[in-house]
């Protein structure tokens, strides 16, 4: 009997609480409901990790930076350098390097003919000491281990994006520009949600950061294409772009077709 009475009181309390949350004129409750609805529709499409830890295609014929890592404090102990490690740069005070300057560390990876070389953003380093021809820097953020011979570029702040995944569906092949996936993250044959890939569409095709792309797969060249995923552009070069896979129902691989999503 006591258990039955306790259960009844518990149900009554729950009903009162639910009524209090839904009753008109309670802005806090309505605000929470509205917030929940918003978060179902929008989220962080481009994150700091996408901006500073992804890769891009260094295109054939483009010059490489002339600032490089020439050594490290612990280079006799290990080959890869991460956060808090001290590295030595190929230029110094006489070359205009200043204390406090921040550089992005990049490293060359796989060649992807005819587009260029996959270039990985390894992290960033800050100059802490100067000599005439050498700068001393400390790695502040590490995405991937930096190595002797890696290049450095002046660090530039990127801008993330909050928005809604437009999804993927059947599209008219003539509705917008099309291309192909030419490289998938870390040289896997296939890749999935949250990973990065390169496509052969860039500034030459008027592609911009934040554009969303639908990816299609064909079981055979003579069969209809099927939409398998959605992607967002996170970096744009002349003839290529880096994209992040937002969602997919099947593995995405090099050679899959892509098309700009014009859905509003």
Residue ranges and their predicted role:
Residues 1-2, 29:
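Intrinsically disordered, low-complexity peptide-like regions
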Residues 2-14:
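Bacterial N-terminal signal peptides that target proteins for export
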Residues 17-27:
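C-terminal segment of classical bacterial N-terminal signal peptides
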Residues 25-264:
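Surface-exposed, polar/charged interaction patches used for macromolecular assembly or partner binding
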């Amino acid at each position: 009997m006591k258990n039955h009475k306790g259960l009844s009181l518990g149900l009554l309390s729950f009903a009162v609480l639910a009524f209090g949350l839904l009753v008109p004129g309670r802005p806090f409750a309505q605000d929470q409901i509205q917030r929940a609805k918003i978060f179902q529709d929008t989220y962080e499409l481009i994150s700091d990790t996408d901006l500073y830890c992804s890769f891009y295609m260094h295109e054939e014929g483009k010059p490489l930076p002339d600032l490089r890592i020439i050594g490290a404090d612990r280079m006799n102990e290990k080959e890869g350098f991460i956060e808090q490690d001290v590295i030595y740069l190929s230029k110094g005070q006489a070359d205009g390097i200043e204390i406090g300057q921040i550089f992005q560390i990049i490293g060359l990876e796989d060649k992807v003919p005819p587009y260029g070389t996959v270039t990985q953003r390894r992290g960033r380093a800050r100059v802490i000491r100067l000599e005439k021809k050498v700068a001393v820097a400390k790695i502040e953020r590490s995405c991937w281990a930096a190595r002797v011979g890696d290049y450095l570029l002046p660090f530039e702040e990127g801008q993330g994006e909050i928005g809604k995944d437009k999804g993927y569906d059947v599209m008219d092949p003539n509705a917008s520009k099309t291309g192909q996936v030419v490289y998938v993250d870390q040289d896997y044959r296939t890749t999935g949600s949250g990973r990065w890939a390169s496509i052969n569409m860039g500034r030459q095709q008027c592609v911009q950061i934040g554009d969303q792309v639908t990816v299609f797969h064909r079981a055979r060249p003579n069969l209809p294409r099927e939409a398998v995923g959605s992607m967002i552009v996170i970096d744009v070069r002349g003839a290529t772009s880096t994209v992040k896979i937002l969602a997919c129902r099947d593995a995405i691989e090099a050679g899959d077709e892509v098309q700009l999503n014009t859905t509003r």
